[in-house]
A protein has these predicted regions:
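NTP-binding/hydrolysis catalytic cores, primarily Walker-type P-loop NTPases
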Residues: 1-4, 9-12, 109-110, 122-128, ...
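Conserved ATPase "switch" residues in P-loop NTPase domains
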Residues: 23, 51, 162-163
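Short hydrophobic/aromatic beta-strand immediately N-terminal to the Walker A/P-loop
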Residues: 28-32
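Conserved P-loop
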Residues: 34-100
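Loop/turn-to-beta-strand initiation segments
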Residues: 56, 88, 128-131, 164-172
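Phosphate-binding/switch loop-helix module in NTP-utilizing enzymes
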Residues: 97-164
């Protein structure tokens, strides 16, 4: 029997049952989906539930402001301000452009070798989280526009840092459409999918007749057992994301 303290739960209704044990601690989990699927809600909800378990969470936003994210949480009934007061939650907005510039400067000093230190260009030193959310890798990638080499180096260093510190991380990545349906998984951002220990995909679903809904799938979780199914989800006010583990997608539909 695995030790319970080796795993984390998201606390999202119906989701954790899809795993045999849970999300392994210290692993990097990619949260992928197209616009409007609920990626940020998934991560905000997981962050809040993790804080309720007494664990520190750092939510790093590269798009929305701290006030905006707190407002989102409050709308769902998640008391972000209370968690901040208790020292369990920190939501901070970062500039992806500043990070890209810092990486370029460090690479110049290191003569373009893999000697940059992610810690010096990203993470605060006065907060020691067990869980980090990065929202989003897509925003960071856009700041490295035309500099794929530098972005790859940064991502490799980021994953190494998270692994070294044994920090469980949820990394949001937006995709224009599911990239693995009907073929080999493709990652337009190079090594991200390979480096991630897990991939959770959230979808918009369009059924025949035009009805719309949502779905979620665990695509990958290295070394762990999980249900290989795509199941229905809903996003409800005052509840957040709800997963229906016994409602597998059936019939004619398109994932977007």
């Amino acid at each position: 029997m695995p030790k319970k303290d080796k795993y984390l739960k998201t606390g999202i209704a119906g989701f954790d049952i899809l795993f045999e044990h849970g999300i392994p601690k210290g692993k990097a989990i990619l949260i992928e989906g197209s616009a409007g699927t609920g990626k940020t809600i998934f991560c905000l909800q997981t962050a809040y539930n993790t804080c309720r378990m007494g664990k520190k969470v750092l939510y790093m936003s590269f798009e929305e402001s701290e006030d905006s994210l707190i407002e989102h949480m409050e709308q769902f009934g998640w008391d972000a301000i209370e968690m901040q007061k208790r020292g369990l939650l920190r939501i901070t907005r970062f500039s992806a452009i500043d990070i890209a510039r810092s990486v370029e400067a460090l690479l110049s000093e290191a003569k373009k070798e893999l000697l940059i230190t992610t810690e010096t260009v990203l993470f605060p030193h006065d907060f020691d989280p067990e869980v980090i959310v990065i929202d989003s890798l897509t925003a960071i990638a856009s700041a490295f526009s035309g500099e794929d080499y530098r972005f790859r180096i940064y991502i490799e260093q980021l994953f190494r840092y998270l692994e070294k510190k044994k920090i469980t991380s949820y990394l949001i990545k937006e995709t224009p459409a599911p990239t693995h349906i009907g073929g080999v998984y493709k990652d337009e951002h190079g090594p991200i999918a390979f480096l991630a220990d897990g991939i959770i995909c959230i979808y918009n679903v369009v059924y025949t007749g035009g009805k719309r809904g949502g779905a979620i799938e665990i695509l990958k979780m290295r070394g762990e057992s999980f249900k290989k199914i795509t199941v229905k989800i809903e996003i409800k006010s005052k509840s957040g994301l709800i997963v229906y583990p016994n409602q597998e997608l059936k019939g004619n539909y398109v994932l977007t």
